[in-house]
Amino acid sequence: MRVPIAVVGPTATGKSELGLALAEHLDGEIVNIDAMQLYRGMDIGTAKLPVAERRGIPHHQLDVLDVTETASVATYQRNAAADVEAILARGRTPVIVGGSMMYVQALLDDWEFPATDPAVRAKWERLLATEGVAAVHAALRAADPAAAATILPTDGRRMVRALEVVELTGKPFAASAPRIGTPRWGTIILGVDRDTAELDERIARRTALMFDSGLVAEVRGLVERGLREGVTARRAIGYAHVLAYLDNEYDLEHAKERTLIGTRRYVRRQRSWFRRDPRVRWLDGADPGLVTTALALLGDAAAAPATTERTTQ
């Protein structure tokens, strides 16, 4: 019986490469679980694998939103779960790859989301609109310090949602999250990490490569498609900083530095989140035998070799 495999962990550790290798070995299909890779056209700054590098393996939950649309954890959960179940029904192995923390938990733990109240939400949205993300972050820090430490300080929408839940339930935002138990579908969760110094160097190289590969031009093109109006997309690491550069808030070198610092901070949050989950089986992304080690950890789930002819998606 096939079970899904999840490959999670911090940014730039090598999750995508391992996910591809496992999908090849397990006759699998990839389900993306990186929130910013949901967006069409956000390719360079999210390190999205080009189609030519996907080895003919079908990928799901990539390029499903326009930059003007708002990403929703609940919507992702519903759509990605349908993808996982369809892959299983085809007799293939879902390989879930990415590092967006709440998206991972929502999918694998079947998170039931609290109700919403338009009046309460509108109050916090007014604060966001009139005083900005710093004021919303301060309010969240006062109401729920743990949530404020977990949610990206520039993610106004998610902070508004957290404040709404705290006000409606009288409990911390995390209290609405599922308890950690057996993952949905019996998913086996692999985590990929690297030595901190090595990962910092990889992030620096990747950030430089993004700018050298045309991130500024990509953002300019997305502005023409409505990026500035996008509630979620415009706040993505790198994209927000290039927008600030285009608005003459600072120069290009400062945009690069802010992108690098933002990525490193995000990595620390990812590490803290995933390391708390005892179900994750950790792997060293620098291990030359990474794929072999991962397959050994998977045990019986990796016993059936790939046999189905692939079609490029």
UniProtKB/Swiss-Prot annotation:
InterPro entries, A to Z: Dimethylallyltransferase, IPT, P-loop_NTPase
Q: What class of enzyme is it?
A: transferase
Could you provide one GO biological process annotation from this protein's UniProt record?
tRNA modification
Q: What is its EC number?
A: 2.5.1.75
Q: Tell me yes or no: is Plastid among this UniProt entry's keywords.
A: no
Q: What is this protein called?
A: tRNA dimethylallyltransferase
* Highest rank taxon of the organism: Bacteria
Q: List cofactor names only.
A: Mg(2+)
Protein family per UniProt: Belongs to the IPP transferase family.
Record gene name: miaA
- Residues under site feature: Interaction with substrate tRNA: S100, R121
The record describes the protein's role as:
Catalyzes the transfer of a dimethylallyl group onto the adenine at position 37 in tRNAs that read codons beginning with uridine, leading to the formation of N6-(dimethylallyl)adenosine (i(6)A).
Source taxonomy lineage? Bacteria, Bacillati, Actinomycetota, Actinomycetes, Mycobacteriales
The chemistry this enzyme catalyses reads:
adenosine(37) in tRNA + dimethylallyl diphosphate = N(6)-dimethylallyladenosine(37) in tRNA + diphosphate
Task: Name the positions where substrate binds.
Answer: T11, A12, T13, G14, K15, S16
Assembly state and interactors?
A: Monomer.
Keyword annotations from UniProtKB, A to Z: ATP-binding, Magnesium, Nucleotide-binding, Transferase, tRNA processing
Write down a Pfam family by its short name. Answer: IPPT
Q: Which residues bind ATP?
A: G9, P10, T11, A12, T13, G14, K15, S16
Query: Which one of the record's GO molecular function terms can you name?
Result: tRNA dimethylallyltransferase activity
